[in-house]
Amino acid sequence: MATAEELQKTWELTVQVDQRAGDESMKFKLRVKGNLHIGGLMLKLVEKIIAPQDWSDHALWWEQRNCWLLKTHWTLDKYGVQSDADLRYTPQHKPLCIQLPNMKYIKLTVSYSTVVFRAVAEICRTLNIRRSEELSLLKPTDENSKKKKKKDKNPVLEDIIDMDVVSGGSGGSASPLYSKTMIPTYDPENGMPVSATSMWFGDNPLTSSQPNLPPAELAKMYQPMSMVDKAVINAGWLDSSRSLMEQGIQEEDRLLLRFKYHCFFDLNPKYDAVRITQLYEQARWTILLEEIECTDEEMLMFASLQYHICKLTMSTEPLDFSNEPEIDEVEAALSNLEVTLEGGHADRILEDITDIPQLADSLRLFRPKRLTLRAYKDYWFVFKDTTISYYKNKEVSSGEPIEQFHLRGCEVVPDVNVTDRKFGIKLLLPVADGMNEVYIRCDNENQYAKWKAACILASKGKTMAYSSYRAEVKNIQSFLKMKSMAPPPGQAAPELETMEMNAECFVSPRYSKKHKTKQLTCRILEALHNIARLSLMDAKMRFIQAWQSLPEFGIKYYIVRFRGSKKDELLGISYNRLIRIDISTGSPVTTWRFANMKQWNVNWEIQQVTIDFDQGVSIAFSCASCDCKVVHEYIGGYIFLSTRSKDQNETLDEELFLKLTGGQE
């Protein structure tokens, strides 16, 4: 019997116990002391529960404080738990409904107690997606679709893939989606499976592309119409340094798994079947729902690639890699992708070049001014280092130029229509009070490819002496070839009857309204001539590569208020730069590159982000469309991704990621 003095030191604590499989929860009252550690409390609780079961996955959740009590050696006093605390003894792993980039839903048991960064890594391991640091979880914009009762007659719910059933596992540690008897062995040098995907990857529904929706269904889906709408969507990214439960996510809630950071490292068709397919699907939906802007010509190119991929998907065995290109061709494609993305490989200066190459051509120039028609004038242009100079003609090019453009930190925007033989480059040059526009017009594809590639490198502070220049030129030439509507010489005109699907399925609803079905079919089949020989995986890679070439690729928008300003503006965050954008016109005002960033800080009390760049440039802003933690994490995440290299294995440096992206804690 406890003495009266001992009873005065103890107090009553109520704990609700959640059980699995839909069993009703139980409530228990325990007499405890403040010096009782969490592990001892759980032991007391389990001893009092009559129903025998495995409680190893259970942990204590504190409702009022919205936190897990995971440090079992901490006492109740240290956590601040008192008699009025509302504690739940609940499973740490719970089912979650996840919409994949291909818009399909899966149900998967994930950890609700670990930080989201680690939970996403668990999800990607189960789905066999490498480089989980590139993905994250996003709250759907329609909160009504977040929580659905099981009795709801929702056609989407009936199509959910239960991954615990598919992978033959359940509970805390879901099994990866491959045969347990054929688990791949990973090379410690590069983190790659020793055997090819086709050898160990099972019959995986996630490697096949989804059929395109009928036009009527596509039209019903939500389409962001402005940058402000996109800013609302981007506010929904979960905090990677907090758990699902801490962010209000409950059992069987719905979240979207998406590629958050558009810096795709080491894409390999031999081992990344799921990753490439899901990346293609995310790219495809951004085109169809007009979440990213593209020209009519580009829309047709994407439509022809989708049609080609659909045909190959229906006619090819899911794991037939016999038609895939040999490794040298794959490496070439990957090289192009890495050039576009700065995906972590080291760009080096070519050893055999003693003098930095330069370009010299007769081009046309236009400087937009108010109330003037667009009139291009011929000049002699010289591109040297990271600077463009132009002269009245070639004969006077040894003297002083009319003007020079310094391209470091500029924006390079294509102004191209291959069908109309228009090959233009728009340069947005940073100046003290914003950006100056300059238009340069080239004569042909090859000239355009060389000059645009040089401009892209110069904007990053690199010259044509870097190894990536030649690959960038080839990448641009390949992109132009895909956009060309002209069939190869001697090729007969397409027969409209040969198209087995509705052409309107492959373009955005807005674009389909501009053209009759017959006209659209004809144009897609014409564009198909340039890609008809691509294999399934190569076609997906080309689609991704073309998506990366769009001016708006990878830019996430947020509504912010800059220090000293009295109006809201847009901040665009890309994989290599920050862009200040006029919210009324959508035009870039200033660009700051991550390469020039010295440091950034967050004042959590006033929710303000401050960033210091080279040459004494400093900016500060508060966020209007989201918590500043979302923007802080985006910046830190891209800095983290820039530290990756092929020499490292696939072990994630979680500590470094959380250090760069974490909050006040």
Positions of the model-derived regions?
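Intrinsically disordered, Pro/Ser/Thr-rich cytosolic linker and juxtamembrane tail regions that serve as
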Residues: M1-E665
